[in-house]
Regions:
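Intrinsic, low-complexity transcriptional activation domains
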Residues: 1-7, 16-23, 44, 101-104, ...
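Acidic/serine-rich, low-complexity amphipathic helices located in mid- to C-terminal regulatory regions
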Residues: 99-108, 118-222, 240, 245-249
Length: 319
């Protein structure tokens, strides 16, 4: 699963560093195990049922850790929960969801949903309503969960000083003292900045909400360059992230131009003025594709998994 996600570095892929994963980043450790247990079936008899049980127990523990994070219920003053690894864990959970998201939650008390019985209407729209409930609602729940997790990740990033230019104001290194090198911590911090920018802005446009990230901070992150001296040999993450950042900025420009408000968008479509704007953005999209998808025939795992989501019809119409 790691090659399909741009969130984690290769540091914890080394077995020699698993001790630090367990002791320094407990939330990230539990999240990795929880997500892996959903998609990896254990060998032997009863592997699928054991896999289901392990995933459910790990998800319960992840929920407890998130509750501790939100309500500040750390068991000691030297907490391991408020760290860069927890931000990475929240990003992972917003990208790879637990199985129980689409099942009714366990209830140990009064639930108003049990009192309000659904209205049964025998009408022509019943099949459409059923389709909405079966197909659209699960996707909506996924987006809602991701939105809340990303909000928590952004809040924790501000608390730790992830976006501060002055390292003296940062509070994200104390957890890793004596275990992880300063260069590795700095690299993870810079990666988290860009990942939050991309994930929050793209999800905000998809669900029709205002981005949680202030405009000034978005410009600052987009303008910062990650030092390639910190990257690992052969790491294609920087090239992929540069292309993703450029595409995100371009998508934001399209959204701000075409859809600043419902009335303005309707006026644009009725007047036909949007045709000239389409030609303008088509040129920019072609330039982006030439810069990031065609040179040297390079295709990283990130590009294959991320940009393959662009529909072929969109490629034909835009590119």
């Amino acid at each position: 699963m790691t090659p399909l996600s741009p969130i984690l570095t290769n540091f914890y892929a080394d077995h020699n560093n698993h001790h630090w994963l367990v002791t320094r980043d407990p939330v990230l450790c539990c999240t990795i195990l929880m997500l892996s247990s959903r998609y990896h079936v254990l060998p032997g008899a009863g592997g699928e049922s054991r896999n289901f049980f392990i995933h459910h127990r790990l998800w319960q523990h992840c929920q407890q850790l998130v509750v501790r994070l939100i309500f500040g219920q750390e068991k000691s003053s030297h907490t391991r929960i408020r760290s860069i690894g927890t931000i990475e864990a929240l990003l992972l959970m917003s990208e790879w969801h637990p199985r129980s998201l689409h099942f009714p939650p366990e209830s140990d008390g009064w639930d108003s949903d049990l009192v309000l019985a659904p209205e049964h209407q025998e009408s022509e729209g019943s099949s459409a309503d059923r389709w909405l409930e079966d197909m659209i609602e699960p996707a909506k729940r996924s987006d809602q969960m991701s939105w809340m997790l990303l909000g928590s990740a952004l809040s924790l990033a501000h608390e730790l000083g992830i976006f501060e230019l002055d390292d003296k104001k940062c509070d994200y290194t104390s957890v890793y003292e004596g275990s992880i090198s300063d260069d590795q911590i700095k690299l993870r911090r810079q990666r988290v900045q860009r990942l939050l920018y991309v994930y929050i802005n793209q999800l905000a446009w998809r669900i029709g909400c205002v981005s949680l990230m202030p405009q000034s901070l978005s410009h600052a992150i987009a303008g910062r360059q990650i030092s390639r001296a910190l990257s690992q040999p052969g790491d294609e993450w920087l090239a992929f992230m540069d292309s993703w950042m450029d595409l995100t900025k371009l998508a934001k420009s399209v959204t701000d131009t075409f859809f600043p408000s419902v009335s303005f968008a309707r006026q644009q479509f009725h007047s036909g003025r949007y045709i000239d704007l389409l030609d303008h953005f088509r040129t920019l999209l072609v330039r982006w594709k030439d810069d990031h998808l065609r040179p040297q025939g390079r295709h990283s795992p990130f590009q294959s998994s991320g940009f393959s989501l662009i529909p072929s019809s969109m490629n034909a119409n835009i590119f």
